[in-house]
């Protein structure tokens, strides 16, 4: 485990002001995150960029078990320095599975203790470096929030994923009721170990959240989920979108729909394929799945194979685009007829905003945070989690150019008006200012 400076660049304007003795115009912030891919990292990228524009100084602290993904939305152009606190993952190749499961419980406790030791040292370092506050990005289950237990500085947690509801049961072994007694007992013993690991993570997660001076969430759904989970109050600070990058390009639209997100079952790409398969072959669009991952970092290769086989069996044309560059993604949004977004209880769903900013209607599941960004009948179509309903919505868009054009225009205008990152940071700074005493000059402008 180590804490070290990765020797990142300093923003030249800030250095020049410090040399000249200019009065400090903004806060000095320690920004802690895990450097994962996905919407939470994009949010960190955009928020840090906007904070740097406004004169705030940000140092990055990457806190994680294992190696971070440093290539996905790096914060380096906008920060002063980057530090990393890392714990190497503990290999667990024991067999049989029940032995590995119970050894995993001991390893989980060992890693929690190791992190606590490092976070005690880090808490002292952060205080010595004179930060105004510590910002911690949180996605359950996340080890980052354990840092609050070792801080004397004010701490702000931004909870991108407030609950583990959509992960529950994914590792549980099942045994039919008519299975032999030994098989049922074996599954129960394994599941007991899995439950203990989950319990350890929940306890540490809740303790860390309770230690924060302020908790922010990205949606009303996340705020409600956090309160339901542990009666913890929070404030909503919604995401935005970079409308200078994600914008209509007026490109021809192919008879194709897009499903976006990591290749994991909770993103429900298979539901999109099944929905498209309900449409007659003559009208059936192709499906493109865009994922921020590369095959080497893909979380669930088995699920990827299942998707490809399902598309083949259902006679749906499927293409998977891995780790597209930003401009490629913008072009992709502009070339498809719709984003079909059906994840399980998505806390927010940043890709829906990106698609709408490009003038692409969103067919979204009426769940979670998606209900708060997609306006049914105005910027897209909301449906229940039903492949037939989703298929009918896709078919409506394919058959009606008038509907596509109307939703497209309204979606782009709506996002440009209501969902820009500048508004996110306005809200963020107001909330931070309510818990930080003596804000520096112009910090809340």
Regions found by a protein language model. Give the residues of each.
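Glycosyltransferase donor-sugar binding loop
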Residues: 65-67, 286-306
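Membrane-proximal helix-turn-helix segments that form the acceptor-binding/catalytic region
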Residues: 163, 175, 179-215, 224
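Conserved donor-binding/catalytic core segment of Leloir-type glycosyltransferases
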Residues: 250-267, 273-278, 287-289
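Nucleotide-activated donor-binding/catalytic signature segment of Leloir-type glycosyltransferases, i.e.
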Residues: 301-324
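Short alpha-helical donor nucleotide-sugar binding micro-motif in glycosyltransferases
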Residues: 331-336
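Aromatic "clamp/platform" in nucleotide-sugar-dependent glycosyltransferases that forms part
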Residues: 344
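Short hydrophobic beta-strand element within catalytic cores of glycosyltransferases
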Residues: 361-364, 374
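Conserved acidic donor-binding segment of nucleotide-sugar-dependent glycosyltransferases
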Residues: 376-377, 381-388, 396-402
């Amino acid at each position: 485990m180590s804490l070290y400076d990765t020797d990142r660049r300093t923003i030249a304007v800030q250095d020049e002001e410090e040399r000249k003795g200019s009065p400090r115009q903004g806060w000095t912030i320690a920004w802690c995150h895990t450097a994962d891919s996905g919407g939470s990292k994009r949010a960190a990228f955009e928020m840090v960029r906007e904070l740097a524009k406004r004169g705030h100084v940000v140092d990055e602290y990457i806190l994680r078990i294992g190696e971070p993904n440093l290539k996905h939305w790096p914060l380096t152009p906008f920060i002063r320095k980057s530090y990393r606190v890392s714990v190497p993952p503990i290999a667990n190749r024991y067999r049989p599975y029940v032995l590995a499961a119970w050894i995993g419980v001991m390893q989980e406790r060992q890693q929690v203790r190791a992190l606590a030791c490092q976070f005690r040292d880090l808490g002292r370092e952060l205080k010595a470096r004179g930060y105004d506050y510590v910002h911690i990005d949180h996605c359950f289950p996340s080890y980052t929030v354990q840092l609050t237990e070792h801080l004397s500085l004010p701490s702000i947690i931004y909870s991108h994923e407030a609950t583990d509801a959509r992960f529950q049961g994914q590792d549980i072994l099942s045994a039919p009721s008519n299975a032999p007694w030994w098989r049922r007992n074996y599954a129960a013993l394994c599941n007991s170990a899995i439950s203990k690991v989950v319990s350890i993570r929940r306890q540490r997660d809740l303790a860390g959240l309770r230690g924060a001076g302020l908790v922010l969430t990205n949606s009303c759904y996340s705020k409600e989920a956090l309160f339901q989970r542990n009666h913890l109050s929070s404030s909503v600070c919604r995401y935005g979108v970079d409308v200078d990058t994600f914008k209509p390009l007026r490109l021809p639209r192919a008879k194709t729909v897009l499903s976006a997100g990591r290749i994991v079952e909770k993103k429900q790409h298979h539901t999109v394929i099944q929905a498209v398969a309900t449409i007659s072959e003559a009208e059936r669009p192709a499906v493109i799945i865009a994922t921020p991952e590369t095959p080497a970092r893909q979380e669930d290769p088995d699920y990827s194979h299942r998707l490809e086989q399902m598309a083949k069996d259902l006679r749906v044309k499927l293409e998977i685009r891995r780790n597209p560059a930003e401009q490629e993604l913008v072009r992709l949004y502009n070339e498809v007829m719709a984003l079909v977004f059906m994840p399980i209880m998505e806390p927010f769903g940043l890709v829906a905003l990106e698609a709408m900013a490009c003038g692409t209607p969103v067919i979204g599941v009426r769940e979670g945070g998606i209900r708060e960004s997609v306006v049914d009948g105005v910027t897209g179509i909301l449906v229940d989690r039903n492949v037939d309903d989703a298929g009918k919505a896709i078919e409506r868009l394919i058959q009606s150019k008038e509907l596509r054009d109307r939703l497209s225009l309204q979606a782009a205008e709506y996002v440009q008006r209501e969902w820009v990152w500048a508004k996110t940071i306005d809200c963020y700074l107001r909330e931070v200012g309510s818990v930080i005493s003596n804000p520096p000059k112009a910090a809340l402008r």
